[in-house]
């Protein structure tokens, strides 16, 4: 897939960037690929990654997706782009919604426009379950990012830049997520702070996140959105599983939902489920290719009506305590924390 090609990863020093680079470095992909460009704004994280990975095919570019010129300059000669740069903390985006817009919407506009300008072959845009029926600023900004990508995809001619979207559930042990928080609280002997015990979240590993992007990269057509089917758990069961893994008897305190949080998340809306292709472990949501000539649709009508429910963390496979423990123990992050406990 990547033979003699140049790949750019925006936000490349984040959790996804580290995971995909780890995959590439452990496989033959790193031997086949021409160059991987890490584009991000944090020079310290770039320096740490440069030292830790120490590979001649990794090139580092300081820049911000908010600045079109910096992303356009860095994208010269790039064949493929994984767009992972984002503001993703829900409460932070609630307090600073314009910052979410500047990065997640306008930044995405810059990345997509630069990719088209530089005749990039394919772009995979990383989105989130919070973009489906959004109630918070982060989800709204990601929903608009998806709309931007699909709108631009709709305007592309055959042979031009292919734009696809991947939509994640909760990525376990990613930076700023609840699993590192719970483990920190356990190790410090503090109370485990749970927002709402019956709240459910999809459980997706960083390995799964890389699998999803590579699947979309291999199979994506113009304007496709890809979702990976994932199990879910309540937050309370997740906390108790970590307690058992670490042999902790820390008290649990319920603190109530944070700003902008939903009781459960949706990965596919009921409207999208009506047109989604079931690909086994994934759903593909094809682009709506209709134009603005609506008159004919009043005559022809819709071919399909949404008869299905949305795909949510409430109606997907729900893991019990034993199953959550088994899943958590497959995570490198949890194993490393156990060694250092």
UniProtKB/Swiss-Prot annotation:
Enzyme Commission code(s) on record: 5.1.3.2
The keyword Membrane is assigned to this record: no
InterPro entries: CapD_C (IPR013692), NAD(P)-bd_dom_sf (IPR036291), Polysac_CapD-like (IPR003869), Polysaccharide_Synthase-Rel (IPR051203)
Catalytic activity: UDP-alpha-D-glucose = UDP-alpha-D-galactose
Gene Ontology BP terms: lipopolysaccharide biosynthetic process
Enzyme class name: isomerase
Pfam family for this entry, one: Polysacc_syn_2C
Lineage: superkingdom: Bacteria
Keywords: Isomerase, Lipopolysaccharide biosynthesis
GO molecular function: UDP-glucose 4-epimerase activity
Family, as annotated: Belongs to the polysaccharide synthase family.
Function, as annotated: Epimerizes UDP-galactose to UDP-glucose.
Name listed for the protein in its UniProt record: UDP-glucose 4-epimerase
Taxonomic source organism: Rickettsia typhi (strain ATCC VR-144 / Wilmington)
Gene this protein is translated from: capD
């Amino acid at each position: 897939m990547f033979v003699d090609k140049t790949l750019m990863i925006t936000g490349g020093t984040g959790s996804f960037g580290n995971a995909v680079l780890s995959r590439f470095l452990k496989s033959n992909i790193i031997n086949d690929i021409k160059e991987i460009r890490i584009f991000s704004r944090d020079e310290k994280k770039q320096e740490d990654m440069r030292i830790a990975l120490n590979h001649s095919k990794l090139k580092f570019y300081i820049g911000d997706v908010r600045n079109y010129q910096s992303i356009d300059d860095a994208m010269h000669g790039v064949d493929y782009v994984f767009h992972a740069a984002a503001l993703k903390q829900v409460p932070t985006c609630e307090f600073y919604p314009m910052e979410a817009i500047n990065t997640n919407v306008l930044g995405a506009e810059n990345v997509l426009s630069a990719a088209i300008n530089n005749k990039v072959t394919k772009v995979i845009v990383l989105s989130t379950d919070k973009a489906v029926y959004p109630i918070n600023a982060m989800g709204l900004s990601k929903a608009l990012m998806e709309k931007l990508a699909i709108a631009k995809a709709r305007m592309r001619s055959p042979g031009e830049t292919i734009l696809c979207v991947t939509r994640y559930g909760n990525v376990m042990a990613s930076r700023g997520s609840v699993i590192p928080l719970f483990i920190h609280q356990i190790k410090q002997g503090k109370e485990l702070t749970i927002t709402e015990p019956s709240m459910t979240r999809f459980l997706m590993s960083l390995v799964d996140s890389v699998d999803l992007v590579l699947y979309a990269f291999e199979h994506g057509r113009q304007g496709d959105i890809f979702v990976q089917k994932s199990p879910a758990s309540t937050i309370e069961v997740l906390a108790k599983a970590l307690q058992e893994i670490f042999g902790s008897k820390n008290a649990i305190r319920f603190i109530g939902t944070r700003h902008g949080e939903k009781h459960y998340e949706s990965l596919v809306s009921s409207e999208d489920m009506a047109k989604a292709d079931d690909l086994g472990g994934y759903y593909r949501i094809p682009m709506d290719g209709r134009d603005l000539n609506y008159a004919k649709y009043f005559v022809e009508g819709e071919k399909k009506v949404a008869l299905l429910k949305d795909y949510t963390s409430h109606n997907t496979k729900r893991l019990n305590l034993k199953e959550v423990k088994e899943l958590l123990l497959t995570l490198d992050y949890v194993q490393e924390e156990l060694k250092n406990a």
